[in-house]
Amino acid sequence: YYANERIGSSGEAYDIKCQVDQKCMAESGAIIDSAFKSIIEDKETEIVIIPGDLTKNGELESHKSFIKELYKLKESGKKIFVITAGHDYGNSFAFKNDERIEAEGTPFEILTELYKAFGYGEAIAFDEATHSYVAEITDGVRMLGICCDSLNQPKGAMDERHLAWAK
């Protein structure tokens, strides 16, 4: 869960949320920076696959910041494939002082455009309803990126249509 520092990570409302929802929001930037630095320095790593949830709750600001970090990986020569999930859209909020406030969210419909440079643009098969996709990650090797979230079914569920698509 990448959380942009501007969505807040302190105050009474934040502390209350953390009692039941521990996502390391305050530390996520440093964690991503450290992990990506290690991946960049690892000359054997050619392909990086990052399954969602990519952001805390789909805050557009968090997606934009995370994408900047992904470009650093890509510029180092790594091939990157992400798969979005349920926390990447809807239910966006932030913390300011001691309050939980609304934050600009990311519509489900634009996620694949945001992450086009990180797998979705290379899809050889794509399920528009769930954003699941197939991509050839290297010669002769295909990745099936399954997202079991959509606007038309409960988050975290796969229906018969989705299973048939995956086959």
Would you name each region that the model predicts?
Residues S34-D42, K68-K72, W165:
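A generic secondary-structure signal
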Residues Y1-L60:
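N-terminal active-site segment of His-dependent metallophosphoesterases
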Residues L60, S65-A164:
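Extended active-site neighborhood of metal-dependent phosphoesterases/phosphodiesterases
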